[in-house]
């Protein structure tokens, strides 16, 4: 979209407030507050700007929980950002957003990812081009239909005020995006995903972004509240490490946010905030038929109409 009528200050204020609200809620749920790490890029670095990382490791519930806010600018969009808009190659940019990944210790509690962001591409003598992106997706280790339906219905409700067609469109986008092509396997049960979005104009597109961000806590906390006291043992933890290995593979090979950060000279600690604290790989391993581990593959890691 080549409309320069946007207000980056309002977007920034919303994102910073969203990070604070989510971090406070997660700290209260865990019983351990998330530490704050404020950072700023130094002179001579490829990017300008800074951000704040809220992080919890080895908490009471979360083995690792990270939620980062960043607002950075650079002289040229990296390839991962203009893959669908080659005409923007070489433009300067500002990118601001909130991204989180939560890794509970209990294998019956799913990993979750959420991101909301805005990018602005600039070129002297031409109107700026802005767009929004984001979404959220759930990655269970053990599948529960009740949880999947709750997550997807909350996502659908967040998008409904902006058009009935958005949820099925963004759900399919999510199913297609969070897919490990080299494994022919989904990362999780999906959710919603969107990028390069400005078709509703700045005001309405920004309202949609806020609705997605605000839906995160009600989409996730009821699920982990239900599962947090489920007993587990070494078998479940071993399968959790195996599934986390798939998470690592996706993030390092396919994830646009990770590639954008690495290609643009971003802050490595923030970029790799999504990595699980432990992960594992087994050679040519397959779960025994009829087990809960096999059921995850056959019933949950396939596209379904959960809502």
From Swiss-Prot:
Chief location: cytoplasm
Pathway(s): Porphyrin-containing compound metabolism; protoporphyrin-IX biosynthesis; protoporphyrinogen-IX from coproporphyrinogen-III (O2 route): step 1/1
Residues binding substrate, per UniProt: 99, 115-117, 265-267
A Pfam family this chain is assigned to: Coprogen_oxidas
Annotated keywords: Cytoplasm, Heme biosynthesis, Metal-binding, Oxidoreductase, Porphyrin biosynthesis
Active site location: 113
Subcellular location(s) of the protein: Cytoplasm
Amino-acid positions noted as binding a divalent metal cation in the UniProt annotation, renumbered to this chain: 103, 113, 152, 182
Highest taxon above the source species: Bacteria
EC number of the protein: 1.3.3.3
Cellular component aspect of the GO annotation: cytoplasm
GO biological process, one term: protoporphyrinogen IX biosynthetic process
GO MF term set: coproporphyrinogen oxidase activity; metal ion binding; protein homodimerization activity
CC cofactor: a divalent metal cation
Site (Important for dimerization): 182
Region (Important for dimerization): 247-282
Enzyme category, top tier: oxidoreductase
Catalytic activity annotation: coproporphyrinogen III + O2 + 2 H(+) = protoporphyrinogen IX + 2 CO2 + 2 H2O
HAMAP family: Coprogen_oxidas (MF_00333)
Oligomer and partners: Homodimer.
PANTHER family listed in its UniProt record: COPROPORPHYRINOGEN III OXIDASE, MITOCHONDRIAL, OXYGEN-DEPENDENT COPROPORPHYRINOGEN-III OXIDASE, MITOCHONDRIAL
Biological role: Involved in the heme biosynthesis. Catalyzes the aerobic oxidative decarboxylation of propionate groups of rings A and B of coproporphyrinogen-III to yield the vinyl groups in protoporphyrinogen-IX.
Family label: Belongs to the aerobic coproporphyrinogen-III oxidase family.
Protein name: Oxygen-dependent coproporphyrinogen-III oxidase
Source organism per UniProt: Burkholderia mallei (strain ATCC 23344)
Gene name as annotated: hemF
